[in-house]
Amino acid sequence: MSLRVMIFNVSIFTLKCINSVEAKPVVKVTPDQRVFRGETVTLTCDIQRGGNVQWTYSWFKDGNTFYPYRTTAAEISFRADESYSGKYSCRGERSDSQRSDTSAAVTLTVSDLKPKPELTADPAGAALTGNTVTLTCRMDLSPGWDFYWYKHTLNSETKTETNSYRVKIDSVSDGGQYWCRAGRGKPVYYTQHSDALWVNVTGEREHSM
């Protein structure tokens, strides 16, 4: 009796090994798990310890199949709107019908509100020629954004990777209106422009004797 039980258990173990593999998928979200309507979102099914083999990927949203249900590429992309909010998971299957586990679910939240930054200046108020004014584009957002700066007109821009921009006041013409906005992803998703900030240049800095 003991021998029969042992053989039965070994048979179950062998059958389990044939139908599944010890590969652990992880869903990665680009650019972030919190995005805005109109952003392009990319989901990647990263199968850890999956080996150098060809996988077919199955995708699930809130536990249900998600279009495209099965793909040969590890990535899928879509232009997000509120209907895409939910919990996403994936699973891999090899050509020999062996399957990975299903990944843990990752939550994607899509907001309908397009963010609008606030532009501030330091020092605030009037500026003197010869001085430097630091502009800051303030937003309550996650890292990974680039920032775009506009002087006098919205037709030309300067791009930075940080949310601050130093303006050297060389002459009265450096005064006037300034704006900023942020962007991320490919294609770039832009926030709204900030309200215009007026930099008033009043005169020259006093020079010490």
Regions found by a protein language model. Name each.
Residues 1-209:
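Extracellular domains of the immunoglobulin superfamily
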